[in-house]
């Protein structure tokens, strides 16, 4: 890795997962995603609204059918973290388990994820902190 200004996201549980700043690039360059650790600090995850590069130990989680924002991804972060106790050294959180992991989300009347509710919920939490 060459030193630079682009955040490099590793399987860390601190500093929003940023373990270095680099100038090189690769196919893992992304933004507006959750970086979910499946090695190292397992299931720890951070929201990355900025462009960054991800290590092989961090999977990028992006919504397919919805343009996620900070609030929706922070809601998702918490839901994903609730799975942490399930995984340990003997039962590793790998890519296959990550893809099969079921998470419970609020839904609309037609059974679709209620992204508006998720966004408003986090916004209310933020406003309560002010």
Residue ranges and their predicted role:
Residues 6-9, 58, 72-80, 118, ...:
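Short, structured motif recognition centered on aromatic/hydrophobic residues
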Residues 11, 26, 42, 66-69, ...:
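A conserved ligand/cofactor-binding region detector
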Residues 20-77:
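A short beta-sheet element
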Residues 47-49, 86-91:
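Catalytic micro-motifs at enzyme active sites that drive phosphoryl/nucleotidyl and oxygen chemistry
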Residues 97-130:
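Amphipathic alpha-helical coiled-coil/heptad-repeat segments
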């Amino acid at each position: 890795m060459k030193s630079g200004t682009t955040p490099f996201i590793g399987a860390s549980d601190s500093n929003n997962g940023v373990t270095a700043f680099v100038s090189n690039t690769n196919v893992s360059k992304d933004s507006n995603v959750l970086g979910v650790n499946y090695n190292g600090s397992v299931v720890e995850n951070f929201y990355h609204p900025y462009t960054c590069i991800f290590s092989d130990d961090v999977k990028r989680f992006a919504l397919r059918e919805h343009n996620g924002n900070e609030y929706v991804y922070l809601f998702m972060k918490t839901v994903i973290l609730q799975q942490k106790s399930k995984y340990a050294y003997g039962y590793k959180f790998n890519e296959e388990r990550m893809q099969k992991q079921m998470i419970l989300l609020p839904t609309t009347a037609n059974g679709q994820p209620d992204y508006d509710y998720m966004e408003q919920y986090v916004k209310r939490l933020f406003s309560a902190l002010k």
